[in-house]
Design a protein with these regions (language model features):
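Extended accessory and catalytic-adjacent subdomains in large enzymes
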Residues: 2, 6-24, 28-51, 55-219
Length: 219
């Protein structure tokens, strides 16, 4: 219920002109929502050369038509390649290329100086927009459970087959995806009772800010 509120706020902030802080943070949150990245930490970026949404550098992205292509090294040294399609986010990325500095997600302060966004900025924005103490990590746990739910909803699936696309989307191992991201109720349902559950499943219609699978998971 808080997610549609956040997504409406993202649409509003990303529609603004200029490179204000709220628009830049909204761009990061949109990327978290769409691509399920880790939020990023500057310490890991400098010491381990591993990156998340807030620490992405210009060299990590390219624009191919209407897609934003990301190629970067994530946690545990895993090389990731992602394609993201979003009109407002693409418009922002085109604009931010003109700023000095290596960081992809920057804003202009009151003096006109370019400043990078950090994880604290992102988590504060999410909590304020959703009116609850949610953080960037919740996008990964939510996204993981939505993917797992979809596997269950669309046909008989083994536990291994349910977890595989989650691990792929998150850039995690199947073991970590199961332990730390997928809701335990979905794990239990996959092991026992999925056929009976599926026979009574009626997915709601999608709304502007929630997909059918998201609404089904909430229900």
């Amino acid at each position: 219920r808080a997610l549609p509120k956040l997504r409406a706020r993202l649409d509003s902030d990303l529609s603004k002109r200029g490179l204000r802080k709220d628009r830049t943070v909204a761009a990061v949150v949109r990327l978290l929502d769409l691509a399920k990245l880790r939020v990023g930490n500057e310490h890991y970026a400098t010491t381990n050369k591993s990156f998340g949404a807030t620490t992405l550098r210009r060299r990590h992205f390219d624009i191919a038509g209407r897609k934003i292509m990301l190629r970067y090294r994530a946690k545990s040294g895993q090389d990731r390649e992602l394609a993201v399609t979003d009109t407002r986010l693409l418009r922002f990325v085109r604009q931010v290329q003109d700023l000095p500095g290596q960081h992809l997600f920057q804003y202009l302060d009151e003096d006109g100086d370019a400043r990078p966004i950090n994880s604290s900025d992102v988590n504060a924005y999410i909590a304020e927009a959703m009116g609850a103490p949610f953080t960037a990590k919740h996008f990964r746990t939510w996204g993981a459970s939505v993917i797992a739910f979809e596997q269950l909803a669309t046909g008989p699936v083994s536990l291994k087959a349910m977890i595989a696309p989650v691990a792929e989307a998150l850039g995690n191992t199947p073991a970590i995806s199961r332990k730390s991201y997928i809701h335990p109720a979905l794990i239990a349902l996959c092991k026992d009772g999925q056929e009976d559950w599926r026979s009574t499943l009626r997915l709601p219609r999608r709304t502007r800010y929630l997909s059918r699978m998201e609404r089904g998971l909430i229900a």
